[in-house]
């Protein structure tokens, strides 16, 4: 289950960025970002993910775009940017 500080579907930033904790249910095909094919875009390979955020687990990590909250590594949002390296 999601941690208490997980980004919720009704979060204003989540709505603005089209965030979905399940990338397969997101708008990543219609709103795809450059760098990888849409089906390969998810939070785990995004430069904004913060693996060492407080409360992070294997499935839930921090994100620079959602301070103090956790995102699902299998999620996607419209700010997805391929992590360097």
Curated annotation (Swiss-Prot):
<keyword id="KW-0408">Iron</keyword>
<comment type="subunit">
    <text>Homodimer.</text>
</comment>
<dbReference type="GO" id="GO:0019646">
    <property type="term" value="P:aerobic electron transport chain"/>
</dbReference>
<comment type="function">
    <text>Specific class of high-redox-potential 4Fe-4S ferredoxins. Functions in anaerobic electron transport in most purple and in some other photosynthetic bacteria and in at least one genus (Paracoccus) of halophilic, denitrifying bacteria.</text>
</comment>
<keyword id="KW-0813">Transport</keyword>
<dbReference type="GO" id="GO:0042597">
    <property type="term" value="C:periplasmic space"/>
</dbReference>
<feature type="binding site">
    <location>
        <position position="77"/>
    </location>
    <ligand>
        <name>[4Fe-4S] cluster</name>
    </ligand>
</feature>
<feature type="binding site">
    <location>
        <position position="43"/>
    </location>
    <ligand>
        <name>[4Fe-4S] cluster</name>
    </ligand>
</feature>
<keyword id="KW-0004">4Fe-4S</keyword>
<keyword id="KW-0574">Periplasm</keyword>
<comment type="similarity">
    <text>Belongs to the high-potential iron-sulfur protein (HiPIP) family.</text>
</comment>
<dbReference type="Pfam" id="PF01355">
    <property type="entry name" value="HIPIP"/>
</dbReference>
<dbReference type="GO" id="GO:0009055">
    <property type="term" value="F:electron transfer activity"/>
</dbReference>
<protein>
    <recommendedName>
        <fullName>High-potential iron-sulfur protein</fullName>
    </recommendedName>
</protein>
<feature type="binding site">
    <location>
        <position position="63"/>
    </location>
    <ligand>
        <name>[4Fe-4S] cluster</name>
    </ligand>
</feature>
<dbReference type="GO" id="GO:0051539">
    <property type="term" value="F:4 iron, 4 sulfur cluster binding"/>
</dbReference>
<dbReference type="InterPro" id="IPR036369">
    <property type="entry name" value="HIPIP_sf"/>
</dbReference>
<keyword id="KW-0411">Iron-sulfur</keyword>
<dbReference type="GO" id="GO:0046872">
    <property type="term" value="F:metal ion binding"/>
</dbReference>
<keyword id="KW-0249">Electron transport</keyword>
<dbReference type="InterPro" id="IPR000170">
    <property type="entry name" value="High_potential_FeS_prot"/>
</dbReference>
<feature type="binding site">
    <location>
        <position position="46"/>
    </location>
    <ligand>
        <name>[4Fe-4S] cluster</name>
    </ligand>
</feature>
<keyword id="KW-0479">Metal-binding</keyword>
